[in-house]
A protein has these predicted regions:
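Surface-exposed peri-terminal alpha-helical interaction modules
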Residues: 2-13, 18-167
């Protein structure tokens, strides 16, 4: 007799390994929820989005370093700059970008709980929302909008990541 899940997966165009289990199997006879894994295209887009988000983050760090040095004086070296990025509230607004890159990293490298298709779409949506340059938005969106106005390089990279996030 054929496993009903195998038949359902094959009928939907997938293979049984295209489904992953979310949540523990209950001792009460309930089955864990099975979710479709992210497609190869979604995983590739996540990897590309991560790479481009890192480029945006680097460009923002460079732009913010210039802004900081204009306001407060020259930063001695890269080590001092790193300490400022970590500890100075001036750079707090950049944390959502770093956290998004880290989240994509963690989820795409988790072999025990692979990224699901719905989760991949959610990550794309979260990144799109974060990258909305809005002078009236949250701190990141306001300062991102300002940085885009002053850095053509950043604007080009931001456009590239936007295209990837929108599929």
């Amino acid at each position: 007799m054929t496993d009903p899940q195998e038949g359902a997966s094959a009928a939907e165009g997938g293979r049984p390994q295209d489904v992953h289990t979310a949540g523990p199997s209950g001792g009460d006879g309930t089955m864990p929820l099975e979710l479709p894994r992210a497609t190869a295209d979604e995983l590739q887009r996540l990897e590309l989005a991560r790479t481009l988000l890192l480029k945006v983050h680097r460009a923002l760090l460079e732009a913010e370093r210039v802004r900081y040095e204009k306001a407060r004086g020259r930063i001695e070296n890269n080590s001092a700059f790193l300490q400022l990025v970590i500890n100075d509230p001036w750079f707090d607004w950049l944390r959502p970008m770093a956290q998004m890159v880290l989240l994509i990293d963690e989820r795409t490298s988790d072999k025990k709980a692979p990224v699901g298709s719905a989760e991949a779409r959610s990550l794309f949506a979260r990144a799109r929302d974060m990258l909305k340059a809005d002078p009236d938005g949250d701190a990141f969106q306001r300062l991102f909008a300002d940085a885009l106005q002053h850095s053509p390089t950043l604007a080009v990279i931001a456009r590239q990541v936007s295209m990837v996030l929108h599929g």
